[in-house]
Structures are given as C-alpha cells and as structure tokens.
From Swiss-Prot:
K(+) binds at E50. This is S-adenosylmethionine synthase. GO terms for cellular component: cytoplasm. Catalyzes the formation of S-adenosylmethionine (AdoMet) from methionine and ATP. The overall synthetic reaction is composed of two sequential steps, AdoMet formation and the subsequent tripolyphosphate hydrolysis which occurs prior to release of AdoMet from the enzyme. It comes from Mycoplasma pneumoniae (strain ATCC 29342 / M129 / Subtype 1). Residues 99-109 are annotated as: Flexible loop. PROSITE patterns: ADOMET_SYNTHASE_1, ADOMET_SYNTHASE_2. Belongs to the AdoMet synthase family. It catalyses: L-methionine + ATP + H2O = S-adenosyl-L-methionine + phosphate + diphosphate. The gene is metK.
C-alpha cells in the first residue's frame, strides 16, 4: 500500500535506529546522565564526557569543570540497572580531568558565552509526518521503541536491538519495501517464536500506524540467527557513534559533531537543536515543505560565522532569499541567547534524548513552535 506525502521524493531511502541496550547507546546514556547531574548541581558546568564500553569494562573519560560533585560510577549504574545489568557484570574506570583553563577562558569571559569549538551544525524539517520529521526515521525509531515497551510482556526480548526500514519514494507516493530487526533475546526462546512475536507485536502494528502495511513487505527478523550475547559483551560501545540515528537518517546533511555528554556551550549540540527549531518553524508555517538550516561556528566567538537556510518546494508567495532575510533578522544567534531561548540549562533532562533520536519529541524545547505568530507577522512586513 502506497502512502501519500505532501512533497515529492524519488528513490530508496534507508533509515535505521537502535535500542537502549545497544552498546553505543549505553555509552550515550551514561554520558548524558553524568551531564544531567553536573547541570543539576551547577548550571554553569562545562562538560565534555566520553564513555567506552567493552566486555566487562566501562571507562568514563573527558573534561569536566563544575562546582558540584558527581559520583560517576553510581550515575553509570543507574543506567545499567535499568537495562537489567547487575554489579557483577561490569567494572568502572574513571579518567575525568578538569577543563583546560585556556578553553574555559575562551568560552566564558566578559559575561559572554563563546562557542565551545568550531564546527558546522545542521537542522532539518519536512512535512512528511506530524512531527515534521522524515517518515523513514520516525518509523525506524518507532519499531525499537515499541519492542522496548513489550519487554515486560515478552521477557525473552532484551534491550540490545536495531531496526532498518527501506522506503521507496515515487513522487508523492511512498511504499515500504522491507523491515529489518535484529533483537537480542534469551537462550530459552526459539527463533521462530521470536520472529513471530516481533512481526506480529512490533512490525505490523507500527507499519499499520503509519499507513505503510502491505503484504508484499519483506520482514527480516534476526536474519543472522540467534542473538543471545549482546550489549558490550558482544560489541564495543562508544559515545557519539550514532550521529545519523540521532538526527535525520539519510534525509539531511550532518555537520559531523555528536551530542551526548556535551553541555550547552558545545555548539555541536546547541547549534543543531537551534537549527532544528528554526527549520521546524519554517515548515510548520507552510513557507516550504522541506527545510535545512546550516550554522557554522568559530571557537570562542559568541555569534555564528555563517547561517544558511535552504528551502525546497517553497510556497509560491515567498522566496528562499526572503525566508533567509526574515530568519536572520528575527532570531538572536548568540550562544547565550540560544541557550536561554531553548531553556537548555533549566528544562532539559538530556538523558531522555540519548535514545530514539534527539528530534521529533514533542516535549523538547527545540520542538516548540513558540515563534510562529511573530514570524508570520514579520514576513508580511517584508513583502
């Protein structure tokens, strides 16, 4: 069954997602939990936390400058306990250093906040879904989210899992060609039972919800066979290795910087959140069906080096040049103002966004459409 979308695409798009128990995501969750604790105790904390997980070892490193005290090991275990691990499963090694005084002075001086590093950040939105996110990314994330929700009902399912969705676009029509899921499981369940459970309880309900279900779709569940050993016991995990899963899949560009374990002075995170905030406003207002915002930054500088707004399938009333003018004039682009606008130091629990993508969650501050009315008035004045 083909689903109709507002704006045309052509060709195959493949999107993937991973679950909470994936080794890279375990690391992201620990890093963001440490960040949350630092900000909770001292909002001016500067955090650059990295986590490495392999076999029975969890290693936490990085640079942290804070007036608070965070028990890194205890914070890490809160994440691991939620995934069913016990204290016998891992040993922790902590190698946290203080942030360089040179970096600290460059980032925060004279009541200004400078960019914590150079870099390029990208935000994207499109009209394919109500979340203004690409359909493939939303479906891939929905699959692993649903599988996680039924673990209590089907305890042979474990938290390390991946999904992959192939969508074929022909203009304003899109069809799902295949769904792949690899799901860790206990030893006492047969592959046939696991496959039938995942197909009937996860894949079919999600495809039906998004209007994509079709008997021709190929369902691939654990195509490699049994998947009993998972998590860091099977594969090494590291923070920041799922940047495409965290954002927009194959649908948009990426600046290259990861998010987890970084405080809001790190523009890899803050710039990407703000770029999404802007792109979502543009699409929600009907100025374009698809929008990509790119912002480049210079280390220690409070304002961006460049801002570029690219729009596709633009409303005939407007032009890309006009949209760029309105956006550039309306928003305050300083790092400090972005942090304040998105409430990144007082209303965000970063751990919540370490899995299932950082975008499309309606409760996130960067997903709110607070500036719609003001932008609509401003663009009329420009015309």
């Amino acid at each position: 069954m083909a689903k109709t979308i507002k704006h045309p695409r052509w060709g195959r798009y493949v999107a993937e997602a991973v679950g909470r128990g994936h080794p890279d995501k375990i690391c992201d969750q620990i890093a963001d939990s440490i960040l949350d604790e630092c900000i909770k105790q001292s909002p001016t904390s500067h955090v650059a936390c990295e986590v490495f997980a392999s076999k029975n070892l969890i290693m936490v490193g990085g640079e942290i400058l804070t007036t608070g005290y965070v028990d890194v090991v205890q914070t890490g275990w809160k994440v691991l306990n939620r995934l069913g691990y016990t204290e016998n499963d891992f040993s922790f090694l902590s190698c946290i250093n203080s942030q360089s005084s040179e970096i600290n002075q460059a980032v925060q001086s004279n009541d200004e906040i400078g960019a914590g590093d150079q870099g390029i950040t990208v935000g994207y939105a499109c009209s394919e879904t109500e979340q203004l996110m690409p359909l493939g990314s939303i479906v891939a994330q929905a699959l692993v989210q649903r599988a996680a929700r039924i673990i209590d009902q089907y305890p042979f399912i474990k938290h390390d899992m991946k999904s992959q969705v192939v969508l074929n676009y022909t203009g304003n029509k899109v069809q799902c060609e295949s769904v792949l899921m690899s799901v860790q499981h206990t030893q006492d369940v047969s592959l046939d039972q696991l496959r039938q459970t995942i197909i009937n309880q996860v894949i079919l309900p999600v495809l039906t919800e998004y209007g994509l279900n079709d008997p021709k779709i190929k369902h691939l569940v654990n195509p490699g066979g049994s998947f009993v050993v998972g998590g860091p016991m099977a594969d090494t995990g590291l923070t920041g290795r799922k940047i495409i899963v965290d954002t927009y899949g194959p649908y948009a560009n990426h600046g290259g910087g990861s998010f987890s374990g970084k405080d809001p002075t790190k523009v890899d995170r803050t710039g990407a959140y703000f770029a999404r905030f802007i792109a979502k406003h543009i699409v929600s207002l009907g100025w374009a069906e698809e929008c990509e915002v790119s912002i480049s930054w210079v280390f220690s500088q409070p304002l961006p080096q460049s801002i570029q707004v690219k729009c596709f399938n633009i409303n005939k009333e407007f032009s890309e040049q006009l949209i760029n003018q309105v956006i550039s004039q309306y928003f305050n682009w300083s790092v400090a103002k972005i942090i304040a606008k998105l409430k990144l130091l007082d209303q965000v629990e970063y751990f919540r966004y370490a899995v299932y993508g950082h975008f499309g969650h309606q409760t996130a501050p960067w997903e709110q459409l607070s500036e719609r009315d003001s932008l609509q008035c401003l663009i009329k004045n420009f015309q």
